[in-house]
Amino acid sequence: DAKTGDQLEQLLSTLSLAVTRFQIEPERSEVPPGDALIVCGPKSAPIGAELINRDPALTFTKAGRRWWIEHRPSGERYGSPADEDQPQNADVAYVARHRTDERVVVHIAGIHAIGSLGAVHYLTANLATLYGETDDKSFSLAVRSTYDGLDITGSELAAGPFVW
């Protein structure tokens, strides 16, 4: 997660946005004031679960010992290839932008921590295109990425973006 934070800070700096990093307490369920970029899953902090619960398109679900990103309307699921019987060096992550009044809250949650890093890789390469598709609206999507150790070797859209 530290590497994800570093890469997010670098991305935001290239957009001339000021960054103040801080760690969210594990028991926190409320979004901090102002615009925010939050990296955590629903199992690691209540704030992650709270943000995902606001999303009408995607959610996290657990079946057996595996976590999945699920498209609520269709029930289609996106699981981590790292959790398959024949594991691959790949993961899936959830990305959402919540627009509330004049605030923007971006939420990133990998099924595993490396998935969050893959989401940042995807956003770095596709931010302009993504904005062109979603304008200034709330949306969510799923990203699939491949990795070698802690280095992301590729990323692609797995589902979405779903505008809401």
Model-predicted regions and their roles:
Residues 1-164:
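Solvent-exposed alpha-helical segments and adjacent loops
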